[in-house]
Structure formats: structure tokens, C-alpha cells
């Protein structure tokens, strides 16, 4: 007999698995002579649901049960999952962390299920694992990021040689569509928040408007065209290693400057774009993301500015009048007020500066979640603690 999921359960289902018809056919609950896939989610009780093996119908069924973002999915069969396990540093039932608000157990199996559903390739698994691991760091405050009415999204950045191995887009259009790794890994992170953390829109995710960045917000740094050290090196990782940084950021905002030919002028355009009322940073200073285009970076570097100089300048000049900062509706800490102006960052370290994108004099900035979320960088390491030189290093024999 088929059992139905209570609609109120929504995204509280923890395990999602589609088995091949042959494996479920001999179960007593399977209708006579019916070939059907088995969706077997487990929360407080075991629930068996039989769905048509047709992929389109499976996608619709998953959507109706709030397992997806509204886009079609790849059915997560055991065969597909085992291909993902081969690229994991862990075993299928190992728990990486607990993801709030539901404190769902992020097992390797569950992460792989969401990776398959999102359309990831198996070799994307090491990056997906590290992104999910970073989200559980207390300073990231995933509970607050998921539950807030603010439209903060999970932005993930990859550094190191793995960006080439996964054929990630670090150049033209890196924040947009058209790249398999960028699109599907970012999507898989969001599906993990749906199905493991329980952060479904209107249930565990209470963003007033939401954000298109909550579909996928994932890219790599264009290290080859950057005049400065990449982010993971800045944070203490070897240049030849690879790393994933997770951040809580708003949707990116364009900075158009085709006329400035000095470092100061380019940076002034950037800080004036950042210095807006109504962002969280204006009343609770914290991190912000500056994705500088190679052409703007070349101009700034050509003026003799080191990366730390740029971060210092943005910290000192990204400010708003105190009366605008107070409009955020929270008590403004006066220690961030100087000469009747509020600093949007607490220190130069709050300025996350990377280089990405292609030709054109456009830079992108994104405000953060204020003091409520701090970015976390995780290196791609193997079980023995050594850095992975390639995703192939993860392959289990």
C-alpha cells in the first residue's frame, strides 16, 4: 500500500533515493507486476513512495514534495551515487556536519544524492564536500543565514589548479549560465540546504524576497589574469593547492567604469557603488565581496597598488552618513562611527578582493550579511591530511 507524505513535512525529509525497478519489484508493498522506482525518504518514520520510472514524472514528483528548486533533476540512483563515492575522502555514512535550522546530518550519501539531482559530475564531489563542510563552521552562522528575512545567499569561490581540472568558468560570464561545474555545484549546495538543512523558502528560509543567487552562486578566481595573490594564498594555503571559500553575500551589483585610467579613480567608482544605505553593512559592518575585472585590476596594479593597499582604501572609504546607517532598524554600534560616517567594514580584512571575469571594464561588488556571517575557506585535503593535487587523488581503487 502506498503511503503519502504529510504536506507539512515539506523539506523535512532527510533521505531521497530512487532505486531501479528490478530491485524493488519483489517487495510485498509493490503492486502486482508493476515496475516502479522507489523513492525512499526517511525522517521520523520510514516512508515508501512508488513513482513512475519516467524521468519527467520523477522530477515533478520531487518538485511537489519540495525536494527541488523547481528545475528538472537527475534521479539519484544507487548506481549514480556509487560513482560519486569514488571521489570522496570519506565513507557513504560518514557525517560531515549538522546543518541548521533542522540540524540535519550531512552524510556523504545525502550530499551525493543532492549532487546527482543537481546534475553534477562525480568528479565535482570533493569541491561539494568542502563547501558543505565550510558551512558548518560556527563563524559562518548558517542558522542565521538560512533563517533570516534578508536575501543573503551562499556564494562559493574555488581557487587553485582544480578550477582547470573541473573546467570551471573563471573568465567571461563566470557568474552567469553556460558552465557545467559553476551551475551544478552551486545548485547542489542549495539543494543540500533544502533537503538536509530544511531551509526551503517559506519554511526554514524566511527571506522576504529571496534572490536569483539562491539558485547557484559559484565561480572560480581568474588567477592567471590577476596581478595579486589569489584568495586561498592570502589565507595561508599553498599556491599549488586548491581550496573552496563559502561566503554569505547578496546578489552581485555591477560597477561600470570605462573612463577612469588611474587606480584612485577606479577605486573611487567602486567605493561609491558599495556605499549605499539599506544594505546590512551600513548598520552592522562586516564582509563584502569585490570581484574585480582583469582590466580594472591591471589599471589599479599599474598605479603601484598592492592588494593590501586596495583593501585598506575600500575599508576607509566605503562609508555612509550615520543617519542612513541608523535606518537599518537595529541599534548602530557607535564604535563604527567616525566623523558622522559609518564604515561598512570592520577592518581591511572584511574586504574579500578577488579577480575574475573576462574583457570589459566592469567590476562586481556584493554586500554581505554584516557581522552575522564570516567567510570560511577549506582546502581540498585527502584522508592523510595532504593537499590533493588533483581530483583523481580521491579516486578509490
Each language-model region and where it sits:
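Non-transmembrane, aqueous-exposed alpha-helical and coiled segments at domain scale
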Residues: 2-397
Amino acid at each position: 500500500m502506498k503511503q503519502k507524505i504529510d504536506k507539512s513535512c515539506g523539506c523535512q525529509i532527510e533521505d531521497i533515493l530512487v532505486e531501479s525497478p528490478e530491485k524493488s519489484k519483489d517487495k510485498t508493498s509493490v503492486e502486482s507486476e508493476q515496475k516502479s522506482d522507489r523513492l525512499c525518504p526517511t525522517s521520523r518514520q520510514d516512508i515508501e513512495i512508488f513513482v513512475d520510472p519516467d524521468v519527467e514524472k520523477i522530477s515533478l514528483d520531487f518538485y511537489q514534495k519540495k525536494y527541488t528548486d523547481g528545475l528538472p533533476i537527475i534521479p539519484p540512483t544507487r548506481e549514480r551515487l556509487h560513482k560519486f563515492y569514488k571521489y570522496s575522502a570519506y565513507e557513504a555514512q560518514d557525517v560531515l556536519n549538522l546543518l541548521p535550522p533542522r540540524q540535519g546530518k550531512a552524510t556523504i550519501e545525502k550530499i551525493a544524492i543532492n549532487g546527482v539531482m543537481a546534475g553534477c559530475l562525480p568528479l565535482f564531489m570533493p569541491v561539494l564536500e568542502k563547501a558543505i563542510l565550510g558551512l558548518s563552521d560556527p563563524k559562518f552562522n548558517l542558522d542565521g543565514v538560512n533563517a533570516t528575512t534578508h536575501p543573503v545567499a551562499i556564494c562559493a569561490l574555488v581557487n587553485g589548479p582544480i578550477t582547470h581540472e573541473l573546467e570551471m568558468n573563471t573568465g567571461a560570464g563566470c557568474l552567469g549560465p553556460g558552465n557545467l561545474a559553476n551551475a551544478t555545484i552551486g545548485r547542489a549546495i542549495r539543494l543540500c540546504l533544502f533537503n538536509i538543512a530544511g531551509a526551503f523558502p517559506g519554511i526554514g528560509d524566511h527571506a522576504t524576497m529571496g534572490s536569483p543567487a539562491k539558485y547557484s552562486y559559484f565561480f572560480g578566481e581568474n588567477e592567471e589574469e590577476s596581478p595579486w595573490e589569489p584568495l586561498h594564498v592570502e589565507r595561508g594555503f599553498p599556491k599549488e593547492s586548491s581550496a573552496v571559500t563559502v561566503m554569505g553575500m547578496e546578489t552581485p551589483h555591477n560597477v561600470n567604469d570605462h573612463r577612469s585610467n588611474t587606480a584612485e579613480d577606479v577605486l573611487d567608482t567602486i567605493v561609491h557603488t558599495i556605499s549605499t544605505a539599506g544594505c546590512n553593512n551600513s548598520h552592522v559592518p562586516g564582509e563584502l565581496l569585490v570581484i574585480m575585472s582583469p582590466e580594472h585590476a591591471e589599471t589599479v596594479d599599474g598605479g603601484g597598488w598592492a592588494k593590501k593597499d586596495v583593501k585598506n582604501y575600500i575599508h576607509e572609504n566605503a562609508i555612509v552618513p550615520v543617519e542612513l546607517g541608523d535606518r537599518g532598524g537595529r541599534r548602530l554600534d557607535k564604535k563604527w562611527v567616525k566623523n558622522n560616517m559609518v564604515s561598512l567594514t570592520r577592518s581591511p580584512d572584511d574586504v574579500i578582493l578577488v579577480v575574475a571575469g573576462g574583457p570589459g571594464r566592469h567590476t562586481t561588488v556584493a554586500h554581505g550579511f554584516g557581522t552575522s556571517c564570516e567567510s570560511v575557506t577549506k582546502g581540498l585535503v585527502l584522508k592523510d591530511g595532504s593537499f590533493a593535487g588533483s581530483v583523481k587523488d580521491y579516486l578509490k581503487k
